[in-house]
Design a protein with these regions (language model features):
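N-terminal Rossmann-like FAD-binding beta1-loop-alpha1 element of flavoenzymes
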Residues: 108-132
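Low-acidity, Ser/Thr- and Arg-rich intrinsically disordered low-complexity segments
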Residues: 4-19, 25, 31-34, 41
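Phosphate-coordination loops involved in phosphoryl transfer and adenosine-cofactor binding
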Residues: 105-107, 254, 293
Length: 335
């Protein structure tokens, strides 16, 4: 029952403060106990699975830490990436102001060799498009470095907590960070996207009937998330590179595009190439190359480094400046 006003007035502020402090102390004590139980169970699991010793050390103010040997951490997160073949070679040389510049030709230039860029390149290559992937560093992007532990997927309708594309799209844009049309397109495309990764060999967990194991994640009422563990994103990059190698993809590593070139045809601006710096280029003092193309896919990463608080590796830079200089409009940056 609610307290009456005269009852509240009889409570001493000092007594109330002491009661709150006591309650807070009890809650914190119970929380620490729960954390210790979880950590001890983690240690037992690690000892049993990897036959190594993980120690529980106590810090100040009951902040406990698990001291896990680096060998265990490496085994949990390390992924052996494939050896890249098909390094692109220049077709010809042109002279510009007395400087010899190598020329590379392709139909579509993909900037970035992370999960997004490689997936775009693989799908284009499968459809017979002449693709060239240019990357500042192979296996150095956010996908290959962060190793995120879960990916969201669409699940077919079931009797229990069924799912559909509309509700999935609403969940994607429920935080107000993206528009519904983009969310709906991603929801519809996620079926083929996940199926493609499985076809390439992504080792997602399955139950005894062959269904992918799922769990609920943020803004997820149907249980759409699945995971390969702490190496999920790295494994995605691995299988995509393996597929790219199988398809004979041309890749240009150590390459940074600095300008997108475009011209106007019948009043419509179109891309015709890009100027890039190639660290391995020794035929001119600037390391400058020209890539001739008719389409460009910019997959150099999002604006994570623009924010003070970010979970992305600090050395992973995006290429939004290229898009802005080329006159493109940016949207859904906070997706």
């Amino acid at each position: 029952m609610p307290l009456r006003s005269e009852t509240v007035s009889k409570v001493s502020p000092t007594a109330l403060r002491k009661s709150l402090i006591t309650l807070k102390s009890k809650v914190e004590t119970e929380s620490v106990k729960c954390i210790l139980v979880v950590k001890k169970r983690c240690i037992l699991y690690l000892q049993e699975k990897y036959s190594c010793i993980a120690k529980l050390t106590m810090g100040d103010e009951d902040n406990s830490l698990i001291s896990i040997p680096q060998a265990i951490l490496d085994r949990l997160t390390r992924v052996d990436m494939p050896k890249v073949r098909g390094i692109a070679k220049s077709e010809e040389m042109i002279e510009v102001a007395g400087v010899s510049i190598p020329v590379y030709e392709c139909e579509t230039l993909v900037l970035g060799s992370g999960a997004a860029g490689m997936r775009a390149a693989v799908e284009l290559k499968r459809r017979g498009v002449d693709v060239l992937v240019a990357s500042t560093g192979l296996f150095a992007g956010t996908s290959a470095c962060s190793g995120s532990d879960k990916q969201t997927l669409y699940t077919a309708s079931t009797d229990y907590k069924g799912d559909n594309f509309v509700s999935y799209a609403k969940g994607l844009c429920s935080g107000g960070a993206m528009n519904f049309s983009t969310a709906y397109i991603e929801a519809v495309g996620s079926v083929d996207a996940l199926g493609g990764l499985l076809y390439m060999g992504l080792p997602l967990p399955h139950d005894e009937n062959g269904a992918i194991l799922r769990y609920q994640t943020d803004h997820d009422e149907a249980g759409r998330a699945t995971s390969c563990g702490p190496r999920t994103s790295k494994l995605m990059v691995k299988v995509l590179f393996e597929e790219a190698i199988t398809l004979g993809m041309r890749i240009l590593p150590s390459c940074s595009v600095i300008r997108i070139l475009k011209h106007s045809i019948d009043g419509t601006e179109q891309v015709y190439g890009a100027i890039a710096l190639h660290r391995d280029e020794e035929r001119n003092a600037y390391g400058m190359i020209f890539i001739e193309c008719t389409h460009i896919v910019i997959a150099t990463g999002g604006p994570g480094e623009l924010y003070r608080d970010s979970v992305y590796p600090r050395h992973c830079h995006g290429g939004l400046g290229l898009a802005l200089e080329a006159g493109l409009e940016l949207c859904n940056l906070t997706e």
